[in-house]
Amino acid sequence: MNNSEQLIALKESETAFLKYFNKADYELVDFSVVEKLDWKQLNHEDLQQMGERNFWQHEHQIYALRNDFTDQLLRYYSMYPTAATKVAYTGLIIRNNEAAVQVGLENYAPSLANVQQSLKLFIQFIQQQLRDNVHFVVLGHYQLLDALLDKSLQTPDILSMIEERNLSGLVTYLSTEHPIVQILKENTQQQLNVLEHYIPNDHPALVELKIWERWLHTQGYKDIHLDITAQPPRSYYTGLFIQCHFAENESRVLTGGYYKGSIEGFGLGLTL
């Protein structure tokens, strides 16, 4: 496929996404790639993200190029509440001077049934329009870390070693028998079963993970992995997250996660 054909295919995929979810009764939204920001309203996490963002000042006003749709919509709807419970979008995101096209959904009534229906529809779009399918799924939950590791041990060094799966370093700092070390020693496909030995069966994170595992099995997905190493990109990501890796185009990953800040929601996004 030459450059012109790739461009046409990309634009057709964007349009097809909007048509598909418009038909499914999602509200379509179109926000400017240029965000107007107020320094006084930016929190510590906002400021930390400025390192990857392109921003400038004009007449005492700060502007920045969009780097995250969920964050932009959350910021906007916090100021201007919407009656919409599910929205669909397409457009550019720019991170570290690299531009990419993203399509995605935000579910502002994030019941289990609503979120799973959104994921099901998204995968159907991938199958029908992108001619691809989900090869394997990664599940995780941002409450797991607190369940497995005492707050006093959640130092930058230890968190970094967990993220890097540095077992030798973790053994030094935590011990061989520590739950995190024991879980990470297992194959990621087995870690959800192993997790049950280290946290109570009624722990909300484990309950939610098992519900999702069972649902994914009913959808025909058996290759399911647990990730206990991921740390939330923003503090408002407090619950379950999912990554659906593609069978044909291995560089594509449908990602999603629950968040609760000034707005509660569950977002799903795919970079084309």
UniProtKB/Swiss-Prot annotation:
SUPFAM superfamilies: Class II aaRS and biotin synthetases. This function is generally fulfilled by the C-terminal part of HisG, which is missing in some bacteria such as this one. Pathway: Amino-acid biosynthesis; L-histidine biosynthesis; L-histidine from 5-phospho-alpha-D-ribose 1-diphosphate: step 1/9. It comes from the Bacteria. One of its GO terms (biological process) is L-histidine biosynthetic process. It holds the Pfam family tRNA-synt_His. The keyword Mitochondrion does not apply. InterPro entries: aa-tRNA-synth_II/BPL/LPL, HisRS-like_core, HisZ. This is ATP phosphoribosyltransferase regulatory subunit. It comes from Staphylococcus aureus (strain JH1). Signal peptide: none annotated. The keyword Cytoplasm applies. The lineage of its organism: Bacteria, Bacillati, Bacillota, Bacilli, Bacillales. GO terms for cellular component: cytoplasm. Belongs to the class-II aminoacyl-tRNA synthetase family. HisZ subfamily. Heteromultimer composed of HisG and HisZ subunits. It is found in: Cytoplasm. GO terms for molecular function: catalytic activity, acting on a protein; transferase activity. Required for the first step of histidine biosynthesis. May allow the feedback regulation of ATP phosphoribosyltransferase activity by histidine. Keywords: Amino-acid biosynthesis, Cytoplasm, Histidine biosynthesis. Its main location: cytoplasm.
